[in-house]
Amino acid sequence: TSTASKYPQPPYVGVIHRLDRPVSGIMVYAKNPKAAASLSTSLQQGKIEKWYQAVICGKPVDNNGTYVDYLKQDKKNNCSRIVDKSDPDGKRAELEYKVLDCMQTEEKDPQYLSLVEIKLLTGRHHQIRVQMAHMGHPLIGDRKYNLTGTSSPKLLLCAFRLSFRHPVTGKKMEFTLPVPEEYPLSSGKVL
């Protein structure tokens, strides 16, 4: 029998979440509508945990911490910005970060670069990029929010770990990627 007769309809692929176009990393897809509905509900309830790794400009004062801001999306210009908590269009944005590695560049005016692990506690439009830039640590390769220039043709932001409960069995599922090769830091030592 041919594949077409064995599978008369194309397979179902349910997109559960998205990544910004220049972001690399792990994505979750559902194999059927029931699983898609369950996973979408888990995502909305914050039961899908997402971690990212990014290379940022500078070195945060603290090696770990939490950023809480309010973001307002500008759909016309495909960007977001920090607004006051009182802004009715502002949505709470929270993330935790941890510095994994730090290095000094070998330029005429040396600067620090840091490899950070970020756990998203909310999922807002361009959240990591906006919040890190607002704190003075824009992402390397970010042409939208890194106004000081970029030293990489690619945005160094990767969704490297995802954790959730299987929609049918309830078993904890966790998926992890290694640090991308193009990242200039990976020793695990913080200066």
What is the role of each PLM region?
Residues 1-191:
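RNA pseudouridine synthases
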